[in-house]
Amino acid sequence: MSIKAEEISSIIKQQIENYQSELKVSDVGTVTYIGDGIARAHGLDNAMAGELLEFSNGVMGMAQNLETNDVGIIILGPYTEIREGDEVRRTGKIMEVPVGEALIGRVVNSLGQPVDGLGPIETTGTRPIEAVAPGVMQRQSVNEPLQTGIKAIDALVPIGRGQRELIIGDRQTGKTSVAIDTILNQADQDMICIYVAIGQKESTVRNAVETLRHHGALDYTIVVTAAASQPAPLLYLAPYAGVAMAEEFMYSGKHVLVVYDDLSKQAAAYRELSLLLRRPPGREAYPGDVFYLHSRLLERAAKLNDSLGGGSITALPFVETQAGDISAYIPTNVISITDGQIFLQSDLFFSGVRPAINAGLSVSRVGGSAQIKAMKTVAGTLRLDLAAYRELESFSQFGSDLDAATRAKLERGKRTVEVLKQDLHKPLKVEKQVLILYALVHKYLDDVPVHDVLRFESEMNTWFDHNHPELLEEIRTTKKLPDEAKLEAALKEFKNTFVPSEEK
């Protein structure tokens, strides 16, 4: 077989034409300091703020401080294997997390990696954890209610879809229970829920996950956890990972509820990182940009306008107070960013009023416009009645003789407090909330003994389910009160069957 010279030259020409030079240029620096989840590296002159960097052992870091001589890096993983003198290289990427339907029902860490032992998550989409919040013209005002299933909230401090409502109170006052009950109540509301646990004990997160699983709520919930044992950078990033996952759904026209439990621990983790990076401390040793830390997170909650699909993110951030002091630095910051707050008080909690919501200090600035008409009608004067009762209660402790009108107000107040009590993990549908509040406002409870009020409510709900389901259905579908004559007749009929128990 003879090879012709022309063939050889044409093959060589073809090879030369197809040749592509693949030069790979990478910026490489050297670790000059390592410790406490922080590294400093020299030689990364072109690194960008927030860029992901890779250490020689595969652990990732994030560029935070860009200084003249070196770069301050927070390490997103175990740092004990990294040594001074190790290589660290730029990736040219910023921090992203996986997003999409595949995450629903899973427990993931701040980087979007599964931690529930159920195998890898099959998702191709990712979103950067830092994103620009929707602008003024991309939003619309809050106009749809988010039903929490908690009477004291839906009646006194209603929340709308797209709102930011702070839940604030001391430790062990039932903040997490409020959030879990709200998630449980979204079962038939076409909502996706994201529960972000920041700095919680792993046993606490496990309990929350099992509660959600037991009630079937994991079918529409994503849990993002950065446990107390995790490095501070992961606690700092967890809320941003949660809201990035939520934005994917919001921009697809869906409604999302994000719970941040709690932002005090995120602020403490950020303070730790900032002090280790030698940033100047400010009030309570927090860095100067701790306000921006929370404002850029919570501003990403919005109700989008109809041209963008009308999706929404509702944020329920938690802040833990010390001895009820809501005038500390982080509480006042977050109160000023959010659209209202629900204040949980420990003395109410220990006196048996649960949920321990202080109606006087709690407020919802935009939720009122989202409240359904039926609830507005029955709950209109409730807040004022409750405030008047608290005032009279403190006055009546002096033991002075009270006139009949004052005594009647006190008795009504006791029953109001009793009606607003609720068992754990038993959210109540809005039509049944309207029913008991209607009974309260229209004096059907005035002659029911205080200790029988909750029994009256549960028996009334069962009775209406069996005898007048059409009235409940009418409230649910029209969102207005049914014909008052029918409702009054039904309530009178039930009340005739109710037997008060003996005095305790």
Curated annotation (Swiss-Prot):
Gene3D superfamilies: 2.40.30.20, ATP synthase alpha/beta chain, C-terminal domain, P-loop containing nucleotide triphosphate hydrolases. It catalyses: ATP + H2O + 4 H(+)(in) = ADP + phosphate + 5 H(+)(out). SUPFAM superfamilies: C-terminal domain of alpha and beta subunits of F1 ATP synthase, N-terminal domain of alpha and beta subunits of F1 ATP synthase, P-loop containing nucleoside triphosphate hydrolases. The keyword Transport applies. It is found in: Cell membrane. Its EC number is 7.1.2.2. It is a peripheral membrane protein. Keywords: ATP synthesis, ATP-binding, Cell membrane, CF(1), Hydrogen ion transport, Ion transport, Membrane, Nucleotide-binding, Translocase, Transport. It is an enzyme of class 7 (translocase). One of its GO terms (cellular component) is plasma membrane. Its main location: membrane. ATP binds at residues 169-176. GO terms for molecular function: ADP binding; ATP binding; proton-transporting ATP synthase activity, rotational mechanism. The record marks 362 as: Required for activity. Belongs to the ATPase alpha/beta chains family. F-type ATPases have 2 components, CF(1) - the catalytic core - and CF(0) - the membrane proton channel. CF(1) has five subunits: alpha(3), beta(3), gamma(1), delta(1), epsilon(1). CF(0) has three main subunits: a(1), b(2) and c(9-12). The alpha and beta chains form an alternating ring which encloses part of the gamma chain. CF(1) is attached to CF(0) by a central stalk formed by the gamma and epsilon chains, while a peripheral stalk is formed by the delta and b chains. Produces ATP from ADP in the presence of a proton gradient across the membrane. The alpha chain is a regulatory subunit. This is ATP synthase subunit alpha 2. It comes from Listeria innocua serovar 6a (strain ATCC BAA-680 / CLIP 11262). The gene is atpA2.
